[in-house]
């Protein structure tokens, strides 16, 4: 079946480490607008921001992007995009949903497109991205999520686990997980119907819910790592990059 993708960018106002980060100014524009612009350049067709706050919606619409209001009570970004999808596509025109996190202002269209590649395998439920870790301090940084996976090819892993710890042990590369997901629509529906899992709650990583329920996640390995904004330090780094 041909993939018919839509990009949905979840953006909530609440953030414990960096309050209201979606609206943080970077090179004259809110961070969420930078992400929406890059997603639109991927040229899949429709790109929409799903948010829980009118200030974010106003900012997104002011720059000419589509936005939809969603509940403020969602447990995860995937739950938010599922609500948005049901509102905007009740006819089920889209069978593939790309969840591009709203705190990746340096993401490129190429990286977004790369997230679709693992779905060429019909056995894959969810696709995502990773990159080899080259900075020593990132190997022990709990904010850098690592992928434990079995190689399928030179640029592809089947994910077995995701962790904030330094893993796997021993010689060999470590891989940094990049927060973009491409879901088959049926996989997203299954995922959001599941209760948060034990390891998901322990690691605070929603993708573990899928693995704990035997869903298959394949990872496309790319050469670059878009900078995620979780802290004020990250924000200042991004401001210098995009200045």
From Swiss-Prot:
Top-level class of the enzyme under EC nomenclature: transferase
Encoding gene, per UniProt annotation: kdsB
This protein's record includes keyword Transferase: yes
Pfam families referenced in this protein's UniProt entry, alphabetically: CTP_transf_3
Role description: Activates KDO (a required 8-carbon sugar) for incorporation into bacterial lipopolysaccharide in Gram-negative bacteria.
Assigned EC number: 2.7.7.38
InterPro entries the record matches: Cytidylyl_trans, KdsB, Nucleotide-diphossugar_trans
Sorted UniProt keywords: Cytoplasm, Lipopolysaccharide biosynthesis, Nucleotidyltransferase, Transferase
GO MF term set: 3-deoxy-manno-octulosonate cytidylyltransferase activity
Positions of disulphide bridges: none
Localisation: Cytoplasm
Any single GO BP term: lipopolysaccharide biosynthetic process
GO cellular component terms given for this protein: cytosol
Name the UniProt record assigns to this protein: 3-deoxy-manno-octulosonate cytidylyltransferase
